[in-house]
Amino acid sequence: MQSAATIDRFRPPMVIRAFNRFGAMLNGKVSRRIPPEELIETAKRRANLDDFGDGDFREPLGHLLESCWRDARLNAIGTIALRSDVLRILRNRLLLQRDRSLHPEIAQHQIRAPLFVVGLPRTGTTFLHTLLSADPASRAPLTWEVMEPSPPTNAEKQRRIRRASQNLACLEWVAPNFGKLHPVGAELPQECVSLMSPSFLSDQFDTMYNVPGYRKWFLQQDLQPAYEFHRRFLQHLQERENGRRWILKAPTHMFGLPTLLAIYPDALFLQTHRAPLEAITSVSSLITILRRVFSDTVDPVKIGAEAISYWWKTLAKFIGERDRLAPERIFDLSYLDLRRDPISAVRRIYQHFGWVLSPRAENRMREILAKQPADLHGFHRYEAAQFGLRPEHEQEFFGDYCERFSVGSRVSTRPVQLTSALHQSRFVRDGLG
């Protein structure tokens, strides 16, 4: 009997698999080692620019490319994607520096009291990010402007949106239905970890590729250069639209809280909470599916082990550090409360931070809710055992967290079934990334 779990049903199309087999037959001619300087020189030539601005990105880029070569076992599509992504990021860095030179006022923009949505991945952070940024008084980085931020005005806006849509269509081609697992769209809010990518100090790469060498090095680094570039990127985007509240989102911010606060000392935080084993299993499933696009050798059990280790340590670190913040600067929200009544959850958030929820903002949020697919919570299905995760892991790694925030999966007391609070099934299902 065929498994109903999403990772067992989710494979690249036959034409993509055939292309990757052809690439493998070339015996290394496609997936050769890529020297950093080759990509740097190519980016400079294509942009007709040579000033990357302050900050060393060459060492991080070197570690990333070396780990991709040694560890990631990229297929032909993966090698093409890596090269394309790095060239795009390098080109954007060159263009951002040029724009900053032409428009020195960009550096004067103040990023005031940005809200960071954090929490374990797959706890509703993406959904909440989209909902909150629908308020006309707020704003999030949008996918198209993160992919193509230059120029810092609205010049060629529609053309840039079309190009971003075409790029995203490529993902849908190599990974059909991925958008049902994680929303993808040129005009949708983008996770702001992408703003750190030009520093090449970002866990965005670790999500797409199996790069344990890079990951080990990355976790030991000072993230100051990454957050400084994050601010530079936001200042650049703010040149287009100033005066609105920034709504930002990335679970990985829990890892770098002290550095984040050094850059954004008045930052606010919204932390979402879900049964940890459900969240870890869900993100392990998502990473497995994504990496299978770029590699033909993906180990779900290894992904599960890496995920629970990283997020257990990151969450424990963040909880200890967030307790030093004034209570009015952080709000806690249950994933189940968000799913039961999103508008009520938003009202509580606004009340906590002293914001005004205008009728127009609420109407726009309700429009988003009305457009949610009927099968949003049913497409992504997964079970812990596929990733080497066991019921007892929840209490073993997250017991204190579960007790403090009143979360926990029934899986912790039912070794046979993995059950979500809303779907009585052998599988957990979700859709609020």
Which sequence ranges carry the predicted segments?
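Post-Walker A helix-loop "phosphate-sensing" segment adjacent to the P-loop in P-loop NTPases
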Residues: A134-W144
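Glycine-rich phosphate-binding P-loop
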Residues: F116-D135
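Flexible, glycine/threonine-enriched loop-and-boundary segments that flank and lead into catalytic domains
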Residues: F233, E239-D266
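PAPS-dependent sulfation machinery
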Residues: E145-W246
